Amino acid sequence: MKSTDPIKIAVLPGDGIGIEVTEATLPVFEVLDVPVILNYGDIGWEFWKKEGAAIPSRTWQLIASSDTVLLGAITSKPQREAKQELSNALKKSNPYYVSPVIQLRQGLDLFANVRPCFSIDDQSKPFNFCIIRENSEGLYCGFDYFPLPKAIHSLLAESQHWQTIPADEASCALRLQSKSGLTRLFDFAFKHAMQTGMPRVTLADKPNVLRESGEFTRKIFESTAQRYPKIQADILNVDAVALWLIKSPEKFGVIVAENMFGDILSDVGAGVMGGLGLAPSANIGDKGSYFEPVHGSGPRIRKNCANPSAMFLTISMLLNHFGYPDRAKKIVNAVMQVIKEKRFITYDLGGHATTTDMANAVIEHCARLNASCLSKDFNPTPKENLIESDTMPNLLQQLINCNSAEISDALDACGIEGGLLSIKPLSQGMKIIGPAYTIQYLPREKKGTAFHNAANYIDKVPKHSVIVIDNNGQIDCTVWGDLLTHTALRNNIMGTVVHGAVRDVESIRSTNYPVFCTGIYMCSGKNRVYKANEQCPLSINGVTINPGDIIFADDNGVLVIPNDRLQEVVNKTIAIRLTEERIKTAIASGSTLEQAREDYCYEQPWLGINKKRES
């Protein structure tokens, strides 16, 4: 596939919690703007019972036409139980059950199982290691016998111990390993270490017991290691590796092992991470791949209680594999942040959130982090014309085409009261976006007989600011008029918001200078009120405005966006705008309003999620 092509993903939700975590996490592709084509397929226990095939032929056809596979989870049972659950008609055909994951690994020749393990919650002793397990050979290669085949009887006859045991009372499994299979595995492990910056590759085996096959493996490992002189290579007994993974996981880099040893160590690694609910995996071959969380189908886990983190991290691995490392990292960071905050975590992490709750929290964090084109820090003194220039602060650029209704919904989603009640535009069609420069007026105890030049502050206001004046809502005297308007225009001030009255209305309107106010009155405030404070916090109708907070105003009214919450509000505003545009399009195409709202998650429009599945 070309780098610009969408990733064609065969999505196989599977069994049990696999269905739930898949459904809950897939919106992250859209939130992160990843070009994907998702096509759903059938796999798992239900299809074994109904059709006698855990992976139906139609699913293999789907996989063949896809770039990769995303698997939720599958239920797998021993051969006897598998056959017992078939219908009588299927029992007559005597199908042979093979776990779907084994079928995928062998059918697609996915020789490397990759299990990253890293510290998520506790950073006091950080670790980052990866277990790479051989998938196609070793003790899981499929040569597993009971009763023993006659070809093995002669081998038993050579052992004095086994001569005394009847052949029909023994079973065996062969640990078959090939030079080519081990060579490609070890080469993959060292390359992975180089790509991820891990300085050490450890072969976990049991050469002190499996002397012949262990020596065979050792020679191939050491030969491969010579091609990677910058990587430390060592061989340890697998039981020692398990011990030291628990005691000192930070000492390891890449751990490579044959099939069964790697399987066991992978679950040890998941435990070190914090549980199977956090453990992702990838299965990689020369020409294919599939990705799945480690946790399995979780038949004992209650509905909507499973931890979706492993699936999010699995999707992160998929994105990294297909050339989207930045977006992959955003998912990892979002998962870590949600777990750190502990507000929306599932029961296995000590919380009470549902699968959906935690997934939505991770997706929302991803939406915030996906502001790669947005500035990380906002400078309240922008450099160019706010509305017109392409060089205005990037965060504010995102709001140019938005309206106050959309931003108000975003503020509500953030739990922020931002609307300045009763303040309206002096002229229709005006819009303001910019940082607040605050002025506070207070009434004089006694009306003066002379003007006191209370508005000379305007000479110090930085260009592109929005002047916010609190005159306590008074409409019996004004604090803004013609002279201030012309000075503001000369100084490139973006607009004025007055909690009180203004005058010289005709002149102001003729200049197209944006003014928003409570009312209109002709009497000056110069001898009735005085400037008490400048660049101070204001409180207008219960809303606090701090210097540098963002003011957004249009025909609907005036909003205040706290500067420290700007990025969050921008992300949610854009998502809300996207959601409402989708709903409008759906209605224009014949959908009912109720259906369109359901399809596009209108109960949480700030996520910007398309909940419709593509058929």
Curated annotation (Swiss-Prot):
**Coiled-coil boundaries:** none
> Can you cite a GO biological process for this protein?
tricarboxylic acid cycle
Q: Which CDD domains match?
A: RraA_family (cd16841)
InterPro entries (UniProt xref):
IsoCit/isopropylmalate_DH_CS, IsoPropMal-DH-like_dom, RraA/RraA-like, RraA/RraA-like_sf
Q: Name one GO molecular function term.
A: NAD binding
Work out whether the entry's keyword set contains Phosphoprotein.
no
Task: Report keywords, A-Z.
Answer: NADP, Oxidoreductase
Q: Which family does it belong to?
A: Belongs to the isocitrate and isopropylmalate dehydrogenases family. To M.jannaschii MJ0644 in the C-terminal section.
What is the protein name stated in its UniProt record?
A: Protein DlpA
Q: Which organism is it from?
A: Legionella pneumophila subsp. pneumophila (strain Philadelphia 1 / ATCC 33152 / DSM 7513)
The gene is dlpA
